Design a protein with these regions (language model features):
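N-terminal periplasmic "start-of-domain" segments of outer-membrane beta-barrel proteins
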Residues: 7-22
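Gram-negative/organellar outer-membrane beta-barrel architecture
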Residues: 18, 23-226, 232-233
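Extracytoplasmic gating/loop element in the C-terminal half of outer-membrane beta-barrel translocons
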Residues: 60, 265-286
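Short glycine-rich beta-strand segments
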Residues: 140, 237-243, 280-284
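Amphipathic hydrophobic-ligand
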Residues: 157-159, 250-253
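Outer-envelope exported proteins of Gram-negative bacteria
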Residues: 177, 235-237, 272-278
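Primarily recognizes Gram-negative and organellar outer-membrane beta-barrels
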Residues: 219-223, 242-251, 258-268
Length: 286
């Protein structure tokens, strides 16, 4: 029995259960089921209770009680800047969209020197066995001519990508994906030296088409997806810009977050360590 999920569909919770109906009682699987539901980050609290069935003393009934938390957010702002004049930003983010467990977001930031529009969508259960699928599409423009310290240039990037995540243990996933990005640089009378050195000899029109393949791994043992108090999250990723585009490079990233309570009596006090390493290796400029 599942209760308390006024918005979230039952199937979003049931697919995280590891103690199945008509199977042998296993306390470890019940504990794992609770942690997996809590790790979704959709609920303020998750409780699982076992109740004896009166007519069948050798069987128990498991009840799942959840308390939903607000997940959607809408942001909007306006500001003034000496370099960018009026700055506008807006965004919509919704986890567990319409109770389906899917996530989507849209962001808009615009000013006289930069404009960004980005949309992303993730279905964590694209297949019944937990393969996830994500889409991203974005466009970014930047005009540095009004900031003298950056040099005189403009950039215009557009991209779209798709990613898949395949679980192979209760905590581990492997990821793979592909992204296409088109970037065009416009050089003014006083461009940055690194742009002039690279763009003019190798890219006469100062534009590139990048075809980026990626593969990665993650391990998530946190007790909660939004407000963890213990456990860790690791992710390693390799992005490779293939020779199909005008630029070839590899980028390696690694992220580690570790959570631990500072005291045994106060759950809200916790240690939080986040490390991120990133490097980009140029392979070819031909």
């Amino acid at each position: 029995n599942i209760s308390g999920n006024a918005k979230t569909r039952d199937e979003v919770i049931r697919r995280e259960l590891r103690q199945f109906e008509s199977s042998w009682y296993d306390a470890d699987k019940i504990r794992l089921s609770r942690n997996r539901i809590d790790r979704l980050g959709y609920f303020q609290s998750v409780e699982m209770e076992t109740n004896t069935i009166i007519d069948s003393l050798d069987q128990v009934d498991i009840s799942v009680q959840v308390e939903e938390r607000p997940l959607g957010s809408i942001t909007a702002g306006i500001g003034l800047s000496s370099s960018e004049d009026i700055v506008l930003n807006a965004g919509v983010s919704q986890q567990n969209f319409l109770g389906t467990g899917t996530d989507l977001s849209f962001q808009l930031n615009t000013s006289d020197i930069s404009q960004t529009y980005a949309f992303s969508y993730t279905d964590p259960y694209w297949t019944d066995d937990g393969v996830s699928r994500s889409f991203d599409i974005y466009t970014r423009k930047f005009d540095a001519s009004r900031i003298t310290s950056l040099g005189d240039y403009t950039s215009d990037s557009k991209g779209l990508g798709i990613r898949f995540g395949v679980p192979y243990t209760e905590f581990d996933k492997i990821f793979f994906g592909f992204k296409y990005e088109a970037t065009e640089l416009g050089l003014g009378s006083n461009p940055p030296g690194r742009f002039a050195t690279y763009c003019i000899p190798y890219l006469p029109d100062c534009s590139t088409d990048s075809f980026i393949a990626s593969v990665g791994w993650s391990r998530d043992s946190r007790d909660n997806g939004l407000a963890p108090t213990k456990g860790s999250y690791q992710r390693a990723n390799i992005d490779y810009a293939t020779p199909l585009g005008g630029v070839e490079y590899a980028r390696l990233t690694y992220k580690l977050q570790w959570f631990k309570p500072l005291t045994k009596k106060t759950d809200w006090k916790k240690a939080y360590i986040s490390l991120k390493a990133e490097d980009r290796i140029e392979i070819s400029q031909d």
